[in-house]
Structure formats: structure tokens, C-alpha cells
């Protein structure tokens, strides 16, 4: 039962104020006096409005005066009658037809017809017949819409439909333009422009493109066409230059164009006058013009160059600088263009070269080839320059002559002889052989000896005939290779020289003259005289009275009535006297080039001749002595020979300074004699005999040094080969040479005992070298047998070294060794081998060597080197192993151990294949075929193997790296999965998130808003390549790193613009999700609270 409190009204005079749920009990009333509204609280705790203002039912008529304002829908079941205007500011919706007796007008400017099917606007006549219709078919979605206009023609019992497409196309059965039709595009079968008036154009396409430039908007597209589906498409457009044609789906390939100035341009080729038919085009390729047939015309080559082509053959190359003929070039005259049978008109040149610019003043100054005049062809080369014929074959003029008028013929042989040749022939008055006139010199080809400055030589096929030359000294000479005939010869200062004879039949055949005297060589009967002229008649005078020199031509006797010279006298009593300074006087060093009072010069290639220079014959004794030279050896000899050929002997003075005498040589009056057997006899040896007779040197030497033994106080020098000193001893006796110094034994060489050993021994140092009885060699330094050699080996007795040297490591830096090589100071980049061996395989080669040595490089300690490789050349393989002072061993290729390898770990605990590192139970151990185990301090940590591994549903592989049970992989760097073909599979992932490693904590703000900018996707993701190398894809789901990077870039790693793929920290996204969930949780809690309160109000109101 309601209490008094519950039926009281809570009041409010504030417009729009509603009571709070907390101030009303369920069913309690409140009133807003300003709004005239009652409120209560339902059993749900919601505040609800009461009264008609909030709804209700009215049964009966309602008469209302005043304005009626309603917010919401109005539903009328019945007839709506209106006597005044109907003003509607919203939308009037009717479900039936609207029939108006008058007009339906819209002042807003729009009339909309809407339908899920075809929308219509119809036009009917009074008989309700369709005149026309505007309709738009249903094309739902993102499609091109169409509006059609259909017009009836009842007279022709037909209709026409005009279609307007949303893509701008207009289609009509027929279009008639009374004046013109303007449209960007027309699709039709034909355009008829009959009955047009004067000055009308069939097509008027005046585009208003702005700006006027070579861009897309400045192109007027005129026509596009093709002949069938799939065929080539052609486009005709108007651009700034003119009309242009293209092919392709768009303006892809330029074809050809007409320019506004009248030019025509083609992108490929032009064919003119080819055989009939549409398919015959130029086959000369791009940038060509075909004339008449498809492979004759012009073909562009490069910038400024083009070819003329005839039947596919390039014949001329035209360029800015020249025209090149690529085939035989023929210049001729023709009246019909096909043959050259008609000569040209008079004074007509087949080719004219304009050469008058140098003002050469020859004719019209032009060069004319094939100039026809008087029935003959002439060729004129004009100009002030030079006509050059630079051919190895030269210039051939056949037949004809070469006239040089007002100039000269210059022949420049350059570094060869300049030659003019006169060809021989076998007819007429021609010479038989070729004859040449050559001009040359040898001062350049042989500067050290050449003295022929200028030579002009006449030759035929046999040899040279004559030449005239100037020497480097200035003289001029003329030589004839044969006889020389002349009616008279006048010789200048150089005279006449010949290797043949000078022949003259005149009595006075030769005259030598000067202004005062002349000398005439005169043949008179049986004699030849040399006769001087009278004084003053040297050139033309006759012979004088003197006869100073005559030769009897029958006997050869020379008659010189009076012979006198400055230093020589030929006396009538038979002697020749050389007075004054004889020829050849001077030092020995100049004698080869000097003469002598009696001088003979021998020039003979024979090798077995004797040339005497002085000879004396003793007639009574019938013997002859001569002095001369044997030219085979150059030996000067003194020779004796009897008339009967006996007693022929020769004493020789040889070029090497030795002298050979044929028998004993006696000195003085015979007191000393050198015998043929080498013995010397002399009376100086008498003092060494008891009888006083002459003794020879052999006996004297034997007397001086006793054969039985003696002491020499002087030096003994043996200059002899072979066994110059022979020691002879009995069987088993010693045989040696010993040296005593100061009366004490010092050394000996020889056999010192009963065996056949040979020694070299020092008594003082007790060191020696001994060749044993079996041929071994022993070296005993300081009395100790340390080294022993035989044919197989070198043995070193190391006990001597250990007896005198320490074996501790600490002193090795300054100790020598049994084999010790001190190279001294060497270069800073050098290698010196200490021991080297070499061998080759029989019949195979592969000469190889192994050596151990020392290498030095700049500013560091030495390296020990073992070199193994070829000994044939520097290119075949060789391996160099380096041992460094810091313990580093460098191996160029591979270290191969039989089973175990230790790197500072001592003896491995494992007996099989292993590598220990640091200690003997840490390293890599072979775990079977294709498997390696990693072990640390005996604990098996991990393995890798080529064996097959399978994880059902995830992956399988034939090779893997794994840890053993309970072991872990710990990384102090990144763990990176490089390839996009594979993934990382784990049971759980624990990411370090301790607050102790974090600072500057800031909670997310507006997390939901940030999260709303990130989308989740399903997608196909790259998964490596398949067996054929194609990209594989697999379905996946997740986020896009770029989207996350846009709001939280700190969660993304990688270069978005480079090739590095972006990596996303999904844990950071979890933090964002958590913050967004927290925001949603708070909002949901607040909404739940408000809902509960509203439920209570509604519940109270409904009671």
C-alpha cells in the first residue's frame, strides 16, 4: 500500500529537467510544471514519462483548433481530404499511383523516378497510346548506367531507341545533322555527307586543347580503326606538327605523319612504285625508301649517312663529308638511261670537280674526267696542289708519253732508291731487258762507313752499267762497269778511275797537263814513252825532246835514263839505298796501318800458300833462302831449300810469340845448345862434375837434388799436369805428405796406416777429414768423430753435442744446433731454405721439392717455412706451411689428422675421430656417419647431423643442429631467421620482461584508438621456393608491420625503403592489446552500472 510519501509529487520548474532515479521510489510520481510532464520509476529502476503526451489511445472524434505540430510518423487509415494548400517540407511517400488533373511541378528542379527494376518516364496520347518513353534499365552495382529514349513511329509501324551511356557514349540508329554534328566520339557503320553546301567540311574537328604543347591534352584524336577482332589497331591523331598515325591499343607505336609544312615522316620505311598488290613493302628495313622493287632504294645508316641499295646490295654510302662507292663506279653518257653506246656532245665532261678556287688559271680551273673533244676523251687534273698516286704498283702509261712542260719530274724514293725504269720488250727497237736509272746514297743506311752521298746509277737485268756519284768529301766520280770509248776524254781534278782498261788507238793516247807543262803517253813503234811537252804548251803542245821513261813493248824492259827520289837511290852497281826517314817509322802500335821501305800487302783467300817477300838464291850451292808468310796461320818463316828439293827446313815465328826451329839451337859459338828433345848442353855445368867435361842439364839437376832423398831450402813449384808428383810406397806402408812447423808435427795428407784410408789431419787441433777403407768420409772436428758420410746417408754423432751443450728450453735462443746455418743480415722480404730435397717420377715427371727454411718480413720475428710443391716452374702448385713465432700455424689448404686433433687440449680422452680444444675432454667428437657431437668437460651438449628428422605436422629435414636433453642455446646477440622459407617452432617463448631492466614507464593513452588503426589480416605468405624454383605461398594470419610502425615505430625493426624486410615485436602489440582491454573493461563496468540503475527505474514504473 502506497504511503503518503509515495503519492506526493516531486516538482520541477526547469524545462527539460527529469528526476533522478535516486529521488523516486518505484511508482512514485514527479511533475515538470514547465513542460507539463509526469514521471515515475518502474520496477527496473528506470525513469519513465506518463500522460497522453507520451502516448495513448483516443476513442472518438477530436476537434482541434490551432496549429498541429507532430514529430514522428503519421499513419491514416481512410481518406485524406484537404481544402487548402498542402505544404510539405519532408518527403511524401505513396504506395499507389498519383493522378493529377493539372500539372505536377517541382520548384526544386528535380524529378526522381526510382525502381529496383527499370525506371520509366512515359509520354501517352489521349488514347493512352505510348508516344515515347524515357527509361533506364536496372544495372545494379558498380556498372555503367544507361538512359534510353524510345520514340514510336506509328506510320511506319516502327520505333527508334536512342541510348545515352554513363561512359559518354551515345548510340542512335541514325543521326542527321541539319548543319553539323559535334561530338567527341561517334560509333556508326557509315557517315553520309551528301548534299553539303560549298565550303562545308565532311568532318570538322577543331579541338580547343590548352596549352599548345607536346602533351596528351594537346593531341586531337581523329580516328581509330581495325578490320577484325584481334587485328592490329590504327590511330589517326592531330598534334602540333600535323597528322600522325600510330598502332597498338593506344598511341604505342609511331607509324608516319604529315607535318603542317608539307613534310612526310615514316617510322619504318616508304615504298614507291612497287609491283601491284597491297602486301609488297620495302624489305630494306627501318629508315628506308624502296623504289620500283622491295630491295632497291635508299637505306639510312647513321646520323648523316645513308646507302643506296640495288637488289639488296649496298652500292653507295652518302655522308656529309663524302660519297663512297661500294661497287664498281662507271661514269658514262647515255641518251636513253640504259646503254652507253652514244658518245657525249662536244666539249662535254663525264665528271667535273670544281677546283678553280685556288686560282690555278689552267683552262676554266676545273678538273675534268672523260672530257670529250674532237672524238677523243681527255682528262684534266687542275689545281695548284699536287696530284698524288700512292700505289705500290706505281703509275702505268700505255701507250703514250709523259710531257712535263714548265716544270720538272721529281722522284722521291724516301728511304729507298729513287728509280726510273725503262721496260724491255722483244719487238722493234726496244731494249731486251728492263733498264733503270736509280738515285741513292749510303750515308743514312750505314752512317759509320757510308761515304757515297749522292749516286746516279744505270742498270739492266744483268748488273749496273755505269754510275756517277758525289762523295761526302765533295768529290765527283764516274764509273763504267765495262769498257769506255770516247773520241776524247778530259779529266778534271779527280781523274779517271776504272777497274777495267782504258783503251785508245791514238799515238798520243793520254795527256796529263797543267798551265805550264803536259805529259803525253805516246806509243811509238815498239815502245811506250812518257814525254813532257815544252813549257807553256801543257794543254795543246806536242811532245818535247826528253824521253825520261820508256817501256819496250816486246820485252817489257823499262828504261829510266835518270831515276832519283828524295830518300831512295837505285844504283847501277845493284844496291838500293833508302835514305832519310824510312816509311813506317814510329811506334809498334801503328805498324799494322803503316807501310815500309819494302812493303808487300797480301789479299788472298787461299789457305795453303806461302808468300816470300825477300829471296836469295846461291847458284853455286844450288840453294835458296827466303823470308815470307804462311797465310793459313799468319806465321812469318825463314825457309831453306836445295835445287833438288833436299834440305828443306823452316824456322817459324808464330803470331802467339812462340818460335819453332827445325833442329838443335846453338847459342854463341856453340858453348850452349838446346837439343830437339828439350835437353840443354852448356859448359856452365862443368863445376858440378869431377872430370870437368861438359854436362847436360838433366845430369846437372840429378846431381843437385838427390833421388834418394834430400832437403831443399828453397821453394819448389811444379807446373805440370796429370801425375806431376807420385809417392810410391810398399804394401801396407804409409804414404803421406807431412808438414812440420818449428820442428813439431803440424799436419799431414795421405795414407797414414796399413789400410787404404786417406786422411787430412791437423796435429795441433786434432781435427781431420778421413776417407775410410770402404769409401766413407768421416769429419772429426776437434778430435771427435762427429760426421760420417757414405753414399746413402750423412750420420751425425749427436752425443758430442749433448756433451757440450745444454738441453734446456730457456737457453735455446742463443744456442747452436748440430746443423746450424747463420744467414747473417738479410733483406726484409726474403726466404732462405735450410734443407731442400728434390725428386721426379721415372717416365712421368712431376719434378717436386720439399724444403725447410726461414722467411723474413718487415719488423717482426722470423717464420719457419715448409714448402712442398713443384720444381719445374713458378705456375704449378706449391703449398707453403708457415710456423709463426707466436705459435700460429698457417696451412694453405687442409690439416688432416689420422683420428684425433688437439688445439691446446693435450691428449684427447676419446680414441676415435675428434678435435679437442683447450682441455682433453672439450671439443667436437665424431658421432657416426654424418654426425658431429659437441662436448664440454665430458658433457654432451649438442649435435649436428645429416640424418632425417621429423616433427609431425610441422617440418621434416635431412640435416639439423640440436641440443641434448636438458641443454640450452643461449645467445648474447640476435637469433635471426634469414630465409622466408622456414619458421621457428618452440613449445613456449619466455621473453624477458622484468621491471628491473626497464625504466621511464608510461601507460598507453587512447589504446583503443591506436588499436583501431591496426587491422588483422588473413593472407598468403611467402614460403621459399618449390622444386622448380618457383615462389611458394602458404595461408597465414597476423598484422602488417608498416601499419604498426605508423603508430608504434619502436616495435618494428628494418628499413622500410631498402631490401631489409621489417620485423615486428608482437609482445609490444600484446601490451597495446592489454591496455585497450583495460580501457574496454572500465567502460563496460561503467555501462553495467548505468544499466542496473535504469533497470530499477523501469521496474518501479511498471508496478
Swiss-Prot record:
The keyword Transmembrane helix does not apply. Its main location: virion. It comes from the Viruses. The record marks 993-994 as: Cleavage. Proteolytic cleavage and release of the chaperone in the host cytosol stabilizes the folded protein. This is Long tail fiber protein Gp37. It comes from Escherichia phage AR1 (Bacteriophage AR1). Keywords: Host-virus interaction, Viral attachment to host cell, Viral tail fiber protein, Viral tail protein, Virion, Virus entry into host cell. Residues 988-991 are annotated as: Interaction with the receptor-recognizing protein gp38. Belongs to the S16-like long tail fiber protein Gp37 family. It is found in: Virion. Pfam families: Gp34_trimer (PF21446), Peptidase_S74 (PF13884). Transmembrane segments: none annotated. One of its GO terms (cellular component) is virus tail, fiber. The keyword Signal does not apply. One of its GO terms (biological process) is virion attachment to host cell. Residues 993-1091 form the Peptidase S74 domain. Homotrimer. Interacts with the receptor-recognizing protein Gp38.
Amino acid at each position: 500500500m502506497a504511503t503518503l510519501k509515495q503519492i506526493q509529487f516531486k516538482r520541477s520548474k526547469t524545462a527539460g529537467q527529469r528526476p533522478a532515479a535516486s529521488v523516486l521510489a518505484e511508482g512514485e510520481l514527479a511533475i515538470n510544471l514547465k513542460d507539463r510532464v509526469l514521471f515515475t520509476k518502474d520496477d527496473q529502476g528506470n525513469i519513465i514519462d506518463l500522460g497522453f503526451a507520451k502516448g495513448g489511445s483516443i476513442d472518438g472524434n477530436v476537434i482541434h483548433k490551432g496549429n498541429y505540430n507532430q514529430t514522428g510518423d503519421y499513419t491514416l487509415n481512410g481518406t485524406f481530404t484537404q481544402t487548402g494548400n498542402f505544404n510539405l517540407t519532408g518527403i511524401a511517400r505513396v504506395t499507389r499511383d498519383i493522378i493529377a488533373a493539372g500539372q505536377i511541378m517541382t520548384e526544386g528542379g528535380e524529378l526522381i523516378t526510382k525502381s529496383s527494376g527499370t525506371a520509366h518516364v512515359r509520354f501517352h496520347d489521349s488514347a493512352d497510346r505510348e508516344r515515347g518513353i524515357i527509361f533506364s534499365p536496372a544495372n545494379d552495382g558498380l556498372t555503367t548506367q544507361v538512359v534510353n529514349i524510345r520514340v514510336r513511329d506509328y506510320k511506319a509501324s516502327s520505333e527508334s531507341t536512342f541510348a545515352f551511356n554513363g561512359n559518354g557514349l551515345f548510340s542512335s540508329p541514325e543521326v542527321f545533322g541539319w548543319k553539323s554534328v559535334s561530338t567527341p566520339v561517334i560509333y556508326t557503320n557509315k557517315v553520309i555527307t551528301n548534299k553539303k553546301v560549298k565550303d562545308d567540311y565532311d568532318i570538322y574537328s577543331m579541338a580547343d586543347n590548352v596549352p599548345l604543347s607536346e602533351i596528351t591534352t594537346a593531341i586531337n584524336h581523329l580516328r581509330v580503326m581495325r578490320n577484325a577482332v584481334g587485328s592490329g589497331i590504327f590511330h589517326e591523331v592531330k598534334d602540333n606538327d600535323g597528322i600522325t598515325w600510330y598502332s597498338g591499343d593506344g598511341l604505342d607505336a609511331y607509324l608516319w605523319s604529315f607535318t603542317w609544312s608539307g613534310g612526310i615522316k615514316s617510322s619504318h620505311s616508304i615504298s614507291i612504285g612497287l609491283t601491284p598488290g597491297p602486301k609488297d613493302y620495302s624489305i630494306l628495313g627501318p629508315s628506308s625508301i624502296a623504289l620500283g622493287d622491295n630491295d632497291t632504294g635508299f637505306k639510312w645508316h647513321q646520323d648523316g649517312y645513308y646507302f643506296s641499295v640495288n637488289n639488296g646490295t649496298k652500292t653507295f654510302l652518302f655522308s656529309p663529308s663524302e660519297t663512297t662507292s661500294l661497287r664498281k663506279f662507271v661514269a658514262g653518257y647515255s641518251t636513253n638511261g640504259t646503254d652507253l653506246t652514244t658518245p657525249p656532245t662536244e666539249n662535254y665532261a663525264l665528271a667535273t670537280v670544281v677546283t678553280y678556287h685556288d686560282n690555278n688559271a689552267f683552262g676554266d680551273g676545273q678538273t675534268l674526267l672523260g672530257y670529250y673533244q674532237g672524238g677523243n676523251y681527255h682528262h684534266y687534273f687542275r689545281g695548284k696542289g699536287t696530284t698524288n698516286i700512292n700505289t705500290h704498283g706505281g703509275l702505268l702509261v700505255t701507250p703514250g708519253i709523259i710531257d712535263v712542260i714548265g716544270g720538272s719530274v721529281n722522284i722521291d724514293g724516301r728511304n729507298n732508291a729513287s728509280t726510273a725504269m725503262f721496260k724491255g720488250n722483244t719487238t722493234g727497237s726496244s731494249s731486251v731487258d728492263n733498264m733503270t736509272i736509280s738515285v741513292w746514297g749510303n750515308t743514312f743506311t750505314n752512317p759509320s762507313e757510308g761515304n757515297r752521298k749522292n749516286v746516279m746509277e744505270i742498270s739492266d737485268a744483268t748488273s749496273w752499267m755505269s754510275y756517277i756519284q758525289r762523295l761526302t768529301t765533295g768529290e765527283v766520280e764516274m764509273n763504267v762497269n765495262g769498257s769506255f770509248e770516247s773520241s776524247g776524254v778530259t779529266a778534271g781534278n779527280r781523274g779517271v778511275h776504272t777497274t777495267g782498261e782504258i783503251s785508245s788507238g791514238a799515238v798520243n793516247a793520254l795527256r796529263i797537263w797543267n798551265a805550264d807543262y803536259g805529259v803525253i803517253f805516246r806509243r811509238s813503234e815498239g815502245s811506250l814513252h812518257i814525254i813532257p811537252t815544252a813549257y807553256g804548251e801543257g794543254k795543246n803542245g806536242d811532245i818535247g825532246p826528253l824521253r825520261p821513261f820508256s817501256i819496250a813493248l816486246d820485252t817489257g824492259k823499262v828504261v829510266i835514263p835518270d831515276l832519283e827520289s828524295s830518300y831512295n837511290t837505285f844504283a847501277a852497281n845493284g844496291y838500293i839505298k833508302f835514305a832519310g826517314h824510312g816509311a813506317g817509322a814510329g811506334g809498334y802500335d801503328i805498324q799494322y796501318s803503316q807501310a815500309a821501305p819494302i812493303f808487300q800487302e797480301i789479299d788472298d783467300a787461299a789457305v795453303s800458300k806461302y808468300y816470300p817477300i825477300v829471296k836469295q838464291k846461291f847458284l853455286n850451292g844450288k840453294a835458296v833462302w827466303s823470308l815470307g808468310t804462311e797465310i793459313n796461320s799468319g806465321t812469318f818463316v825463314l825457309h831453306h831449300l836445295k835445287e833438288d828439293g833436299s834440305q828443306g827446313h823452316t824456322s817459324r815465328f808464330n803470331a802467339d810469340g812462340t818460335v819453332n826451329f827445325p833442329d838443335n839451337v846453338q847459342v854463341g859459338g856453340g858453348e850452349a845448345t838446346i837439343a830437339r828433345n828439350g835437353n840443354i848442353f852448356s859448359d856452365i855445368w862443368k863445376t858440378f862434375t869431377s872430370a870437368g867435361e861438359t854436362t847436360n842439364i838433366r845430369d846437372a839437376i840429378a846431381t843437385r837434388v838427390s833421388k834418394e832423398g834430400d832437403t831443399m831450402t828453397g821453394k819448389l813449384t811444379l807446373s805440370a799436369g796429370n801425375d806431376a808428383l807420385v809417392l810410391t810406397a810398399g804394401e801396407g806402408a804409409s804414404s803421406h805428405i807431412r808438414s812440420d812447423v818449428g820442428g813439431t808435427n803440424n799436419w799431414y795428407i795421405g795414407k797414414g796406416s796399413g789400410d787404404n784410408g786417406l786422411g787430412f789431419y791437423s796435429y795441433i787441433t786434432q781435427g781431420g777429414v778421413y776417407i775410410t777403407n770402404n769409401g766413407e768420409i768421416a769429419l772429426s772436428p776437434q778430435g771427435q768423430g762427429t760426421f760420417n758420410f757414405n753414399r746413402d746417408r750423412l750420420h751425425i754423432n749427436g752425443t758430442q753435442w749433448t756433451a757440450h751443450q745444454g738441453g734446456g728450453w730457456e737457453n735455446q735462443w742463443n744456442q747452436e744446433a748440430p746443423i746450424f746455418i747463420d744467414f747473417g743480415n738479410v733483406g726484409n722480404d726474403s726466404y732462405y731454405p735450410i734443407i731442400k730435397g728434390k725428386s721426379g717420377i721415372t717416365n712421368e715427371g712431376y719434378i717436386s721439392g720439399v724444403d725447410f727454411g726461414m722467411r723474413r718480413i718487415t719488423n717482426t720475428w722470423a717464420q719457419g717455412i715448409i714448402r712442398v710443391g713443384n720444381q719445374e716452374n713458378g705456375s704449378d702448385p706449391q703449398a707453403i706451411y708457415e710456423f709463426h713465432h707466436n705459435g700460429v700455424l698457417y696451412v694453405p689448404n687442409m690439416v688432416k689428422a689420422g683420428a684425433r686433433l688437439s688445439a691446446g687440449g693435450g691428449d684427447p680422452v676419446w680414441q676415435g675421430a675428434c678435435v679437442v680444444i683447450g682441455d682433453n675432454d672439450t671439443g667436437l667428437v665424431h658421432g657416426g656417419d654424418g654426425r658431429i657431437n659437441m662436448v664440454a668437460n665430458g658433457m654432451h651438449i649438442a649435435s649436428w647431423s645429416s640424418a632425417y628428422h621429423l616433427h609431425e605436422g610441422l617440418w621434416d629435414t635431412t640435416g639439423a643442429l640440436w641440443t641434448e636433453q636438458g641443454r640450452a642455446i643461449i645467445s648474447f646477440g640476435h637469433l635471426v631467421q634469414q630465409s622466408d622459407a622456414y619458421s621457428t617452432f618452440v613449445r613456449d617463448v619466455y621473453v624477458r620482461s622484468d621491471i628491473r631492466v626497464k625504466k621511464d614507464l608510461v601507460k598507453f593513452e587512447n589504446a583503443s584508438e591506436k588499436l583501431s588503426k591496426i587491422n588483422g589480416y588473413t593472407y598468403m605468405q611467402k614460403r621459399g621456393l618449390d622444386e622448380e624454383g618457383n615462389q611458394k605461398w602458404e595461408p597465414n594470419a597476423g598484422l602488417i608491420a608498416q601499419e604498426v610502425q605508423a603508430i608504434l615505430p619502436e616495435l618494428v625493426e628494418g628499413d622500410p625503403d631498402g631490401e631489409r624486410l621489417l620485423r615486428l615485436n608482437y609482445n609490444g602489440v600484446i601490451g597495446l592489446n592489454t591496455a585497450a582491454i583495460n580501457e574496454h573493461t572500465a567502460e563496460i563496468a561503467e555501462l553495467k552500472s548505468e544499466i542496473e540503475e535504469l533497470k530499477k527505474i523501469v521496474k518501479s514504473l511498471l508496478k
